[in-house]
Amino acid sequence: MYNFCIYFYLHIRYVNVSLNISIINVQMLKFTSINKENPSKVESKVRSKNFDEIYANFAKQKAEEQASRCSQCGVPFCQVHCPLHNNIPDWLKLTAENRLEEAYQVSSSTNNMPEICGRICPQDRLCEGNCVIEQSGHGTVTIGSIEKYITDTAWDKGWIKKIEPTINRDQTVGVIGAGPAGLAAAEELRKLGYKITIYDKYDRAGGLLIYGIPNFKLEKEIVIRRTKLLEDSGVEI
């Protein structure tokens, strides 16, 4: 009787493990049945009348579907080749599972401006260009568009709050230059409780993001929204 119980227990464990492995394999192989899709592009006859952004955002269902194409590689080359080493597989998985607020928390933990990077980073040479399923001929995961979708949704849902340091310090820090590096530095220093003043020769903060990138690629309101968040957090520009 004892031997039978042991056998029965091991058999059940084997079946459960096998089922779990099968489920995981199906989840990791979705790229074989779901084709790569990019967000829709505004028609040229409409684009010719303005300088607005030319790509739409993913719909919720489409973003989850495209995020589910990530195979969760053992060695995530997308992350390796990202200059910020963003935790890309993690927030893709969370997006696929409709855990979008958590996806935003992971995305923003290594990136001060994910919605901007999602729009202007050369993903074809970095994360997407080194996606393993791209190398196997299935088409890369649309990482940049999903990154943009996550943070734009976070703004719409009110998940992005002004910085409230746990401690306010008496020391002041001056940041020279209001470009993306200066804005990111100011944000991190403000989180530590320092009083921050950013100095720039131009009348608007953003640097290259404002003065060097056209609206059809990055609308100015996206950058202004970020600088306003810093000002609301106590950063002086």
Q: PLM features: what roles do these ranges have?
A:
Residues Y194-I210:
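Glycine-rich FAD pyrophosphate-binding loop
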